[in-house]
């Protein structure tokens, strides 16, 4: 009997052993491999591939034409823009087997990766970081960082709401949308006063 706690379009392929949480939706022509885990209230767009043993948290949105390969982990509330790219081997060759050389990639809670961005394997994208469209990310990204360009460079900082933060001389900033307070210390930003009901 089909589990009706989540929705799967008739054209999608869900392999035996895949786990999908309640309230999630899987759309046209998507393929979810065995032993993958998808959390609750996720939206998996059209033509998405989710590899074996991939772990996806709750509230994740994956737009069309994205492949999430082995070694990639997506925490809660991550957003993946259309046609963004993950990798899992640093030096692939068609004639050399490197399935034991996958380098893990972690996309932390609330991070956004824009359309057509590329994330090289073996790095971490920090909480609530925002990767701009078309950026090529080759190194670990700190929380709340705004990354643009090729190669990707930090060009600013953003709030949880994805709004650019403007820091004063004391390294203090407020999100104009949420009112949350942030503190810049060296090359790190921390959320010092979250909105009511939110975690810092």
PLM features: what roles do these ranges have?
Residues 2-5, 10, 16-18, 25-125, ...:
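Flexible, glycine/small-residue-enriched loop-and-beta-strand segment within the central core
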Residues 137-140:
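Signature of the chemotaxis receptor cytoplasmic signaling rod
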Residues 143-149, 158-167:
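Short, intrinsically disordered, charge-biased short linear motifs at domain edges
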Residues 154-157, 173:
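Cys/His-enriched microdomains
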Residues 159, 175-178:
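Short cysteine-rich clusters marking metal-coordination/redox-active sites
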Residues 167-169, 181-186:
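Short, non-ligating residues that shape and space the ligands of small metal-coordination modules
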Residues 170-175, 187-192:
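Short cysteine/histidine-rich zinc-coordinating motifs and their immediately flanking basic loops
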Residues 192-200:
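Short, intrinsically disordered terminal segments enriched in charged and Pro/Gly residues
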């Amino acid at each position: 009997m089909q589990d009706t706690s989540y929705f799967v379009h008739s054209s999608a392929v869900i392999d035996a052993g895949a786990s999908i949480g309640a309230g999630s939706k899987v759309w046209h022509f998507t393929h979810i491999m065995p032993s993958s885990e998808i959390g609750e209230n996720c939206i998996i767009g059209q033509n998405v591939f989710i590899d074996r043993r991939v772990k996806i948290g709750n509230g994740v949105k994956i737009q069309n034409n994205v492949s999430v390969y082995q070694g990639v982990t997506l925490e809660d509330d991550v957003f993946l823009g259309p046609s963004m790219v993950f990798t899992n081997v640093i030096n692939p060759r068609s004639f050399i087997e490197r399935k034991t050389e996958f380098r893990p990639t972690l996309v932390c809670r609330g991070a956004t990766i824009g359309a057509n961005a590329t994330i090289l394997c073996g790095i971490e994208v920090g909480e609530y970081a925002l990767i701009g469209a078309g950026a090529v990310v080759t190194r670990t990204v700190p929380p709340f960082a705004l990354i643009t360009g090729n190669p990707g460079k930090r060009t600013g900082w953003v709030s949880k709401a994805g709004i650019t933060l403007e820091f004063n001389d004391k390294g203090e900033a407020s999100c104009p949308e949420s009112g949350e307070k942030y503190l810049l210390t060296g090359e790190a930003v921390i959320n010092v006063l979250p909105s009511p009901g939110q975690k810092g």
